[in-house]
């Protein structure tokens, strides 16, 4: 069908039609509370705290508040799919730690794109008898309102219990001061101290460390070479990682489960605590009172049984991610629905919802370690004969002051060369991967990850030994701009019948991203040559999955153009809190999860001071 007035959908975008989700956002009547027999198993009508989302930020709120005696319910749109440890990292299996490239498929299977423009390619070879689309055809979850030139095409979400922490890299650096939002005004010393206090607690929850790869040959090859090449100019270290090394060959990667065991309580390990997790239960909106001063209900839908229920609580916390937090608010009458129109007045509730969003630029390449580096692995070895010959031997002098490598290194190399004489590489098969960084500084304002890990891209072809491969990922910051927006359709809904998210985003101009690319190219060349097919390149906008600023934090709603205060409380509402990277209002290049967790800890401290848990009858039982 041609794009003409004969097409009934030709001018659909200009009609007054609004979706059911948009109508619900402006509704004022409350549905009746369900009776006891109408609730899914284990669900009550009322709790002290209702949390939406089960990722590491939701788990932080749950841990802090459950341990303080609150009766907490957590609602997660996704399901439990991470094994016996609910919300655990899926890389915590021997299979994936032996072959990290296999984990790429796990990540790809978990990620759901946020906004996909309609493919305008015409299929002109269909049979004349086949139904053909109009110009406004919504197919396969595509978004007809998305401008492909202003999209974050790589942006995606994960809908499972544990969220993205079930497959993330576990990189948890602190924000350098230039990246951090202020928590204490006009007192830099006090602000530094507050951040240090919060970061320390968050690091303890995540089990962050910087020594898990200290006895990796590949890690030390890369680390020492870069330290040597940039001596006195740049500092290199292990990436701060949320992980615990269990053995020389196995690491337990942290996740939401590490922060808080998502098992229902009371149970045998926590007989006096109250917590319930409800997977496959979607939050559809929050209910405001007539005065718009507090939340009086949380609308949820059981995705298995199909029932819609309103839950009551003293405190409501949205931790469903930077996209879904804003989406739920827009579906509840906050901000505005529909394409932003500068001619219209700002909405009265959260006028800056979805404005000033940020996402990081990303440059990527892969290198194959140089012959010089590989030859240096055996610098302390005395090799007699040829592999496979009866007289073949590999020895070294333990503890010699002339050794270039420590004994643990030499012992691993010797054992591998003797046990696996068929292998031309002297690096043990199970040698841990490199995990190196040079952190964000004013002189080079980008974050770096020089490592070998699984992402939704960057798998290594089978013809190359992965022990030789080093991944280079450099992340750049983006200054918050009001014109960079995430908005929600009043006509189109997503797969869960919520207003469709749409991006209106462009990376600001400037030299910083190009300087970052140059830095990566120069630095990576010191380690080896580029892997064919993985030459230096800018990656899709949004592929970093570090979207921020969708519900910004600040001190004053109007002056700072923000949505929540420094306790993560929504302006004007005494009992609604938002958690996650959407709160971060600054230009940042580093991984934001640790910072978002720190803000959640501060938010919990406010909640514990201003709300009382209900009496716990379990406490009176022996």
Swiss-Prot record:
GO terms for cellular component: periplasmic space. Pfam families: GMC_oxred_C. Binds 1 FAD covalently per subunit. Substrate binds at residues 449, 451. GO terms for molecular function: flavin adenine dinucleotide binding; pyranose oxidase activity. Catalyzes the oxidation of various aldopyranoses and disaccharides on carbon-2 to the corresponding 2-keto sugars concomitant with the reduction of O(2) to H(2)O(2). Plays an important role in lignin degradation of wood rot fungi by supplying the essential cosubstrate H(2)O(2) for the ligninolytic peroxidases, lignin peroxidase and manganese-dependent peroxidase. The preferred substrate is D-glucose which is converted to 2-dehydro-D-glucose, an intermediate of a secondary metabolic pathway leading to the antibiotic cortalcerone. Residues 1-28 form the signal peptide. Its main location: periplasm. This is Pyranose 2-oxidase. Its EC number is 1.1.3.10. Its cofactor is FAD. Optimum pH is 4.5-6.0. Active from pH 4 to 7.5. Stable from pH 4 to 11. Optimum temperature is 44 degrees Celsius. Active from 30 to 55 degrees Celsius. Thermostable for 30 minutes up to 50 degrees Celsius. Belongs to the GMC oxidoreductase family. Homotetramer. It is found in: Periplasm. Keywords: FAD, Flavoprotein, Oxidoreductase, Periplasm, Signal. Residues 29-37 form a propeptide. It comes from Phlebiopsis gigantea (White-rot fungus). It catalyses: D-glucose + O2 = 2-dehydro-D-glucose + H2O2. The modification Tele-8alpha-FAD histidine is found at residue 167. PANTHER family: PYRANOSE 2-OXIDASE. The active site is at residues 546, 591. Not glycosylated.
């Amino acid at each position: 069908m041609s794009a003409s007035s004969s097409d009934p959908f030709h001018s659909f975008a200009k009609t007054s039609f609004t979706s059911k989700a948009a109508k619900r956002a402006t509704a004022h009547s409350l549905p009746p509370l369900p009776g006891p027999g109408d609730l899914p198993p284990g669900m009550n009508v009322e709790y002290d705290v209702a949390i939406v989302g089960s990722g590491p930020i939701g788990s932080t709120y749950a841990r802090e508040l459950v341990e303080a005696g609150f009766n907490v319910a957590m609602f997660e749109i996704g399901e439990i799919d991470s094994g016996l440890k609910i919300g655990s990292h899926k890389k915590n299996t021997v299979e994936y730690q032996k072959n990290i490239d296999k984990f790429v498929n796990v990540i790809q299977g978990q990620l759901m794109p946020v906004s996909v423009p309609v493919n305008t390619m015409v299929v002109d070879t269909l049979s004349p008898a086949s139904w053909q689309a109009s110009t406004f055809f919504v197919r396969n979850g595509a978004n007809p309102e998305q401008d492909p030139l202003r999209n974050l095409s790589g942006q995606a979400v994960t809908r499972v219990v544990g969220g993205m922490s079930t497959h993330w890299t576990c990189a948890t650096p602190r924000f350098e001061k230039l990246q951090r939002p202020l928590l204490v005004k006009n007192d830099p010393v006090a602000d530094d101290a507050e951040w240090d206090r919060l970061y320390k607690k968050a690091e303890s929850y995540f089990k962050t460390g910087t020594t898990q790869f200290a006895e990796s040959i590949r890690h030390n090859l890369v680390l020492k070479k870069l330290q040597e090449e940039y001596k006195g100019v740049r500092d290199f270290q292990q990436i701060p990682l949320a992980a615990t090394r269990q053995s020389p060959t196995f690491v337990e990667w942290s996740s939401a489960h590490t922060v808080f065991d998502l098992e229902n309580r009371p149970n045998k390990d926590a007989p006096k605590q109250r917590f319930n997790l409800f997977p496959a239960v979607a939050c559809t909106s929050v209910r405001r009172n007539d005065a718009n001063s507090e939340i009086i209900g949380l609308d949820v839908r059981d995705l298995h049984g199909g029932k819609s229920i309103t839950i009551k609580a003293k405190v409501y916390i949205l931790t469903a991610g930077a996209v879904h937090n804003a989406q739920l608010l827009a579906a509840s009458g906050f901000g505005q629905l529909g394409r932003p129109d500068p001619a219209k007045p700002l909405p009265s509730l959260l006028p800056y919802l979805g404005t000033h969003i940020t996402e990081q630029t990303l440059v990527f390449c892969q290198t194959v370690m140089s012959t010089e580096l590989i030859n240096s692995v055996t610098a302390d070895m005395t090799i007699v004969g040829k592999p496979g010959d009866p007289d073949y031997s590999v020895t070294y002098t333990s503890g010699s002051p002339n050794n270039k490598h420590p004994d643990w290194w030499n012992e691993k190399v010797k054992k591998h060369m003797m046990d696996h004489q068929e292998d031309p590489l002297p690096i043990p098969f199970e040698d841990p991967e490199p995990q190196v960084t040079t952190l964000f500084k004013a002189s080079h304002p980008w974050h770096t990850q020089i490592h070998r890990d699984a992402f939704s891209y960057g798998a290594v072809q089978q013809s190359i030994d992965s022990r030789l491969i080093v991944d280079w990922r450099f992340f750049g910051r983006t200054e918050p701009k009001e014109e960079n927006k995430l908005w929600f359709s009043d006509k189109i809904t997503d797969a869960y019948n919520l207003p469709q998210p749409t991006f209106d985003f462009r990376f600001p101009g400037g030299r910083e991203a190009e300087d970052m690319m140059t830095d990566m190219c120069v630095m990576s060349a010191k380690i080896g040559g580029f892997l064919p097919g993985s030459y230096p390149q800018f990656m899709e906008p949004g592929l970093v999955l570090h979207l921020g600023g969708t519900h910004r934090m600040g001190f004053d709603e109007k002056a700072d153009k923000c949505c929540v205060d420094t306790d993560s409380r929504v302006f004007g509402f005494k009992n609604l809190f938002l958690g996650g990277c959407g709160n971060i209002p600054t230009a940042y290049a580093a991984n934001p999860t640790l910072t978002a967790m720190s803000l959640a800890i501060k938010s919990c401290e406010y909640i514990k001071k201003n709300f009382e848990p209900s009496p716990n009858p379990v406490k009176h039982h022996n």
